[in-house]
Structure formats: structure tokens, C-alpha cells
């Protein structure tokens, strides 16, 4: 019990959570009952040795399956976070989904901030595998949201159709989406929407709850790439993130639909700056300005984001730790995309290719979603600059191929950026 209340208090500057003694007694009774249920289930599992519970991962191709061993599983299986989240809950999405046709997935999620410490013996090697060798035990994350440092941020708009930068943020003291209760999810919505109401100028806007939105309006926002898709992704469904859908989910956007915040999808929040065309520097400037203001407004209300110097910003999927940043463009590459050197060029530039509609889609009319592969080991400014330089290189290659000229595979980028 002390651990649970400690987590809640850690996320608040104020102790107003326990203002009403009567409701406090009811809350205490409810939490005790919930913990008793979890404890009973957990004790039942201990009747079997860990070897009897070890998942069959022989046909799997994800980071978790590569890193998990019977010894690690035996050591961690019976551990729980203060919120009652287990190793098996962390890895279930990777057990249920052996691999992905387009990208290599992580194969596990965190249920709360403490998951990354309690189950560090599996999370650390997974993080190292996913993030190009970043070691969370010996390295520190560096944050830099100074958009003035960006250079050459205007793309050739004959090729680049749109530009986008996004990140995620989690509210400290509340469980992450795989483990959150309805009450916690609604609290996330309340905290974030209340804070967003304080945005001014070109950032001011309105919140649209999915609960009150028609199917037609939802689909239109999805088709226009403003709103997250319906919960059909295996990551969401197998990890328990689609529970109670669409309760306490929604989208906030400014009047121009160039600054958006998703609430309670894969993460507590996703903060997005986007616009048509190729002005990535302007997109990133708005992103930095808006994100800083959102954090200020969150703190003003007694909350804070999950962060530590080793992991950076803490999010549900280990792939989004560190900056949580994905800077991407929709770019037309009809010739380069058919060149056998294309995958190696992307690899050396530390870029990732997705289909036109995202990770689970194919390219339409040779339009690809190109973004940074890394999230850790480099700052936000460094990652956006990598995308700018890399996409400009891809466009130059496309132009050369149009003229019948040869192209070269660039040398690989250094493993990490600023120390």
C-alpha cells in the first residue's frame, strides 16, 4: 500500500489527493481489494517453476525474443512493480506477435515508470539492441530543444509533400496505458486538457473527445493523418492498451491543425507539429515552442513528466525512450526506391522507411514516410538535423537518377552524437 500511495504522491506537488477523509477510506479499501486480487493470481503462478512458464520464442523476430533467456525469466518472473505489473505483462505483446513484415519490433512494453528498473535485466539489453548500442547503465541522455540551431531546414517541395515532428510524454505518478485503470486514464485526460486550455496565440485550440465524436468525423481525421487509428494494432490490443476504448481518448489541436496533442493512445500524450510542404525548420520551431509551453502548464498544475538522466523521457514502448522524437517527411522517390542500394543508404543515414500511411502500410504512388531511426544517444536538435541532411541526400539521389547519373552509398554516421 505504501508503495502505491507513494507513486501517486510523487506525481503531485500537493497532497490534495487525500483532502476528503471519507473518500480516502473508500479509496484505501478499493486499492487493498485490487491488490489482493492481483496477489492471489500471482501466488497461484508460483505453484509452477519458471521453466514451465517460459514462452516459446523459437520463431520470433523481435528485440525481446533475442534478449530474453530462461535465466533472466526465472529471476524476474515473480517480481512485481509497486503498481502490480509483472514481467509476463511486459512481454505479452512480443509473445503474441512474433514479428512484423516491415520493421523489427521491440516486443515488450512498460506498465509504469518503475517497470524499467524492476525488470532492468531484460529492458536494458532490449534498449541496447533497439537504440544502436546505447547503454542505459553507463550513458546519459541529452535534451536540446533549441530550434535556432537547425540549418538547411527547407526541402525541395517538388519531392517533399509534408513535414512532421512528434514526441510522447507521460504524467509521473500515473500508470502507463498498458496498466492504467479507467480512473488513471481519465485523470491523464483531465490533467492534460486542463493544461492545454492555457495555450495562447497560434497554439490556442480545442479538445475533441472520441467519446463525443461521430464515426464519420473520426475517420476523416484519421484519413487526413491528424488522428491516431482505431485500436487494431497488435501492439495496442495484446498489451492491453485498447481497453475501454474510446473512454478518455481524444485529440487536441490548434485552429490551424499544425500543433496537435493525442491523449491516451499508446502513450499518455503524443505532441505533434506538422504541416504540408517542406519547411522542417518551421515545423520544429513550433514543436519546441509548443512542447515547452505544455510542460510549463503541466508543472503549473502540480504535475510533471516522467524523466530520468539515463532513459530520458519515459514512455510505454522502449523504442520511444530518450527524446521520444520522430521527425518525418512524406517524400516522392519513384526511382531511388527501386534502386537496390536504397536500404543501405537509409541504414547509413540512420533513417527509417515506412509506407505512406505509416508503419503497417505500403507506399502509395512511390511516396514514403522517411524518419529518424534513433531516439536515444542524440538530442532532439541532432535527430532533426540528421533527418534534414538525410532527406536532402535522398532527394539529390533521386535527381541524379532522373538524369541518368550514378549515386553513391554515403559512409555510416557515427554511433552517437554529443557526449
UniProtKB/Swiss-Prot annotation:
Superkingdom of the organism of origin: Eukaryota
Binding residues annotated for ATP, in chain numbering: 162-166, 225, 270, 326, 354-359, 369
Main location: mitochondrion
Location in or out of the cell: Mitochondrion inner membrane
Enzyme Commission identifier(s): 2.7.3.2
Substrates-to-products reaction catalysed: creatine + ATP = N-phosphocreatine + ADP + H(+)
Subunit and partners: Exists as an octamer composed of four MTCK homodimers.
PANTHER family per record: ARGININE OR CREATINE KINASE, CREATINE KINASE S-TYPE, MITOCHONDRIAL
Protein name: Creatine kinase S-type, mitochondrial
Organism: Gallus gallus (Chicken)
Amino acid at each position: 500500500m505504501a508503495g502505491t500511495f507513494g507513486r501517486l504522491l510523487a506525481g503531485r506537488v500537493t497532497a490534495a489527493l487525500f483532502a476528503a477523509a471519507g473518500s480516502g477510506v473508500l479509496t484505501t479499501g478499493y486499492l487493498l481489494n485490487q491488490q489482493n486480487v492481483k496477489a492471489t493470481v500471482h501466488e497461484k503462478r508460483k505453484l509452477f517453476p519458471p521453466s514451465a512458464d517460459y514462452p516459446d520464442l523459437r520463431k520470433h523476430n523481435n528485440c525481446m525474443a533475442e534478449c530474453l533467456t530462461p535465466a533472466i525469466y526465472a529471476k524476474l518472473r515473480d517480481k512485481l512493480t509497486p503498481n502490480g505489473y509483472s514481467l509476463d505483462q511486459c512481454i505479452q505483446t512480443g509473445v503474441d506477435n512474433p514479428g512484423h513484415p516491415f520493421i523489427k519490433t521491440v516486443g515488450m512494453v512498460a506498465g509504469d515508470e518503475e517497470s524499467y528498473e524492476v525488470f532492468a535485466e531484460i529492458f536494458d539489453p532490449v534498449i541496447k539492441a533497439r537504440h544502436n548500442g546505447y547503454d542505459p547503465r553507463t550513458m546519459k541522455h541529452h535534451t536540446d530543444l533549441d530550434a535556432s540551431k537547425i540549418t538547411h531546414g527547407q526541402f525541395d517541395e517538388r519531392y517533399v509533400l509534408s513535414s512532421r515532428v512528434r514526441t510522447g510524454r507521460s504524467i509521473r505518478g500515473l500508470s502507463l496505458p498498458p496498466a492504467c485503470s479507467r480512473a488513471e486514464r481519465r485523470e491523464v485526460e483531465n490533467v492534460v486538457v486542463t493544461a492545454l486550455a492555457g495555450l495562447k496565440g497560434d497554439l490556442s485550440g480545442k479538445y475533441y473527445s472520441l467519446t463525443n465524436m461521430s464515426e464519420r468525423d473520426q475517420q476523416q481525421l484519421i484519413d487526413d493523418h491528424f488522428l491516431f487509428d482505431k485500436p487494431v494494432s497488435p501492439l495496442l490490443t495484446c498489451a492491453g492498451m485498447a481497453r475501454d476504448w474510446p473512454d478518455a481518448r481524444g485529440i487536441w489541436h490548434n485552429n490551424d491543425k499544425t500543433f496537435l496533442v493525442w491523449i491516451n493512445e499508446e502513450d499518455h500524450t503524443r505532441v505533434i507539429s506538422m504541416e504540408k510542404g517542406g519547411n522542417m525548420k518551421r515545423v520544429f520551431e513550433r514543436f519546441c515552442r509548443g512542447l515547452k509551453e505544455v510542460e510549463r502548464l503541466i508543472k503549473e498544475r502540480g504535475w510533471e513528466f516522467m524523466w530520468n538522466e539515463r532513459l530520458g523521457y519515459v514512455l510505454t514502448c522502449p523504442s520511444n525512450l530518450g527524446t521520444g522524437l520522430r521527425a518525418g517527411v512524406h517524400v516522392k522517390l519513384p526511382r531511388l526506391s527501386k534502386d537496390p542500394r536504397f536500404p543501405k543508404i537509409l541504414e547509413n543515414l540512420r533513417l527509417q522507411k515506412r509506407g505512406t500511411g505509416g508503419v503497417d502500410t505500403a507506399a502509395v504512388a512511390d511516396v514514403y514516410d522517411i524518419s529518424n531511426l534513433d531516439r536515444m544517444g542524440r538530442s532532439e536538435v541532432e535527430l532533426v538535423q540528421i533527418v534534414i541532411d538525410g532527406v536532402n541526400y535522398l532527394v539529390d539521389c533521386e535527381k541524379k537518377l532522373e538524369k541518368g547519373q550514378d549515386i553513391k552509398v554515403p559512409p555510416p554516421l557515427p554511433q552517437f552524437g554529443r557526449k
